[in-house]
Amino acid sequence: LKGPLIWRWKDWIDRAFINRLNDLPKMVAPKVTGELATGVAEILAAKPLCGGCGAKVGRGVLSSALTKIAPPFDEVVTGAGDDAAVLRQSNGTFQVISTDHLRSLIDDPALMTRIAAVHALGDVWAMGAQPQVGLASIVVPQMSADLQARTLTEITQVATEVLSAAGAQLVGGHTTMGAELTIGFTVTGRKDTMPLTVSGAQPGDVLILTRPIGSGVILAADMEGHAHGRFVASVLAIMGQAQDREAAVLAPVAHAMTDVTGFGL
């Protein structure tokens, strides 16, 4: 048997089967009895911890810790609190530097590397600067030597590709083994004039979004098993898109730009 009607019949059978897997009864966690340490109940009842910006330490906790940092050196124009730190160079130009890392959201090292690299570069682009170099910080789960080598090769190849497309170069990094895959990058950039900072925003400025917001909501739903696959695929594709062209267009006319992550929208 063959023909389009057969394929439609098969598609109907397959979809009926998959729909049965999408409508499962909700599991109820057993009650924990006996004496418990303080905070155990809250931890057991908590939602899964996001691997992205939702995993960031709270603003209040972070601000409290940063107040204990010593005053910056003379060459430090801006430190903690902006997308990237700004350093004044001896020739009158400026260098920006930022670091970011993400715990793996998906079981795809290549795509996760692309997302993490674009995520880190976003801080440099938000300052209106040109990316310069990048250092990778990678935590890989325990696995065989062959699988480790293959995973690290895949990660470095994609990182080199993304950084090169941005006009930057991967110049080194650090690797360790840990509980789960974590990929991060420290990136530097340069700018002839003072980089854009969030403090440059003025009353009456028009707010321009260069990509959709709400990725955290979809990823949180995915962690709970409630997100549609096409929505997750769309989010991952958007997260892997570089924003260099948008930044190049807006930087000459914008009062301020920021990479909308963490404490953003």
Where do the language-model regions lie?
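C-terminal, flexible cofactor-proximal segment of oxidoreductases
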Residues: 1-38
